[in-house]
């Protein structure tokens, strides 16, 4: 089946731009499908291949939910309709969106629903700030429009031309499936201070598995769990769960409250650990909340400051993680590296704190309801000790090879 590059925007304000980008892409020999997402009902011909009324019809409550007369409600409703519309399409080679704040909020939820690997480019006036809410756990590329998307001029023509040709290039040079794609994929979480562990595990398992390493920056855990939820992972070695620290204690690399939920939903084979639970991440010292002024800090670099978690915070984290693990009915092993949770959390290192470590271990043991499938396992090593990496590998192989009950 032929595939097309979908181009979406609100033609009542960006019709010129839509036509311009479509013509540029078609000039490369590729085909386009233009989509109008205007939220004001109109009798005019938008010039798009798919009119706004057609997209609005995909809303569960029908077109009237979109064409309601309230701009905010209309944008939210059209976002739902467009998401459902795009999910229904089987001929999508790429999706290019153009918009301001409203258009970006309208288009990116649909982009998030498309499979990873399908090119997604959002040209937006919002792309110079925090775009995490627009991207989520997807592989959306954001391009700052520089000027508002309000007509063609010497700047917008250059920016939109770049966008058109970037998407066309991504489609033209799409990577063919390689032999490694035949291997089952594993998700692994890593931080700089747990790198030796994850590298050792990946090296050992790479002959049998395609090892996908996710940087545990908040979005990394979300991306990994999205793949697990989509059935694209054969197992998870979630050895770096540091995102929980930031969620609970105001850090800047926080996961969401849904962390671990995909593991519970999918019953995917899971080996977890305490990687970097000794630290909360902040930006430069000037950005640290005043309530933490008297805490122990480590300057990772000019833009990253790490705060040591306390005994009480370790109790809270262990309880939170333990309650999440109790919801998991698949094969689960949570490994405790008694010699420390990171490169900084080891005897003689800046974050070594036996009381905090003991508090975490004790609370996790008290919280987790252990069964034949759900176990907490202790090892007398630091997380970066090669023997701990080997233990993680052995636990993973054991649960993968266990007969299902």
Swiss-Prot record:
A Pfam family that the UniProt record links to this protein: UPF0261_C
Which domain of life does this protein belong to? Bacteria
**UniProt record similarity statement:** Belongs to the UPF0261 family.
Return the protein name: UPF0261 protein YPO3839/y0391/YP_3209
Q: Give the species this sequence originates from.
A: Yersinia pestis
């Amino acid at each position: 089946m032929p595939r097309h590059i979908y181009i979406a925007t609100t033609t009542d304000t960006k019709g010129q731009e839509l036509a311009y980008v479509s013509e540029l892409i078609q000039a490369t020999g590729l085909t386009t499908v233009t989509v109008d997402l205007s939220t004001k009902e109109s009798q005019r011909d938008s010039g798009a291949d798919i009119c706004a009324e057609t997209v609005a019809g995909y809303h569960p409550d029908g077109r009237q939910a979109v064409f309601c007369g309230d701009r905010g409600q209309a944008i939210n409703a059209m976002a739902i309709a467009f998401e459902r519309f795009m999910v229904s399409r089987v001929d999508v080679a790429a999706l290019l969106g153009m918009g301001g704040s409203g258009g970006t909020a309208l288009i990116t939820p649909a982009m998030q629903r498309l499979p990873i690997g399908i090119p997604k480019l959002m040209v937006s006036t919002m792309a110079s700030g925090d775009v995490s809410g627009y991207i989520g756990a997807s592989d959306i590329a954001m391009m700052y429009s520089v000027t508002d998307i309000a007509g063609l001029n010497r700047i917008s023509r250059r920016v939109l031309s770049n966008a058109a040709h970037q998407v066309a290039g991504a489609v033209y040079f799409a990577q063919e499936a390689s032999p490694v794609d035949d291997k089952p994929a594993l998700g692994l979480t890593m931080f700089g201070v747990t790198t030796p562990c994850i590298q050792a595990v990946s090296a050992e398992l790479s002959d049998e598995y395609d090892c996908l390493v996710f940087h545990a920056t908040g979005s990394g855990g979300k991306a990994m769990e999205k793949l697990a939820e989509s059935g694209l992972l054969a197992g998870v070695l979630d050895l770096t769960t540091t995102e929980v620290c930031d969620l609970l204690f105001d850090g800047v690399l926080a996961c969401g409250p849904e962390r671990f939920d995909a593991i519970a939903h999918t019953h995917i084979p899971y080996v977890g650990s305490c990687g970097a639970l000794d630290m909360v991440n902040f930006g430069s010292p000037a950005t640290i909340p005043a309530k933490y002024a008297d805490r122990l800090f480590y300057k990772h670099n000019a833009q990253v400051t790490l705060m040591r978690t306390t005994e009480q915070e370790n109790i809270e984290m262990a309880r939170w993680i333990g309650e999440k693990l109790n919801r998991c009915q698949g094969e689960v092993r949570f490994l405790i590296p008694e010699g420390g949770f990171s490169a900084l959390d080891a005897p003689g290192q800046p974050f070594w704190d036996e009381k905090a470590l003991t508090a975490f271990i004790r609370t996790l043991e008290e919280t987790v309801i252990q069964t034949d499938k759900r176990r907490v396992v202790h090892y007398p090593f630091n997380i970066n000790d090669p023997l701990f990496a080997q233990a993680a590998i052995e636990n993973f192989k054991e649960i993968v090879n266990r007969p299902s009950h």
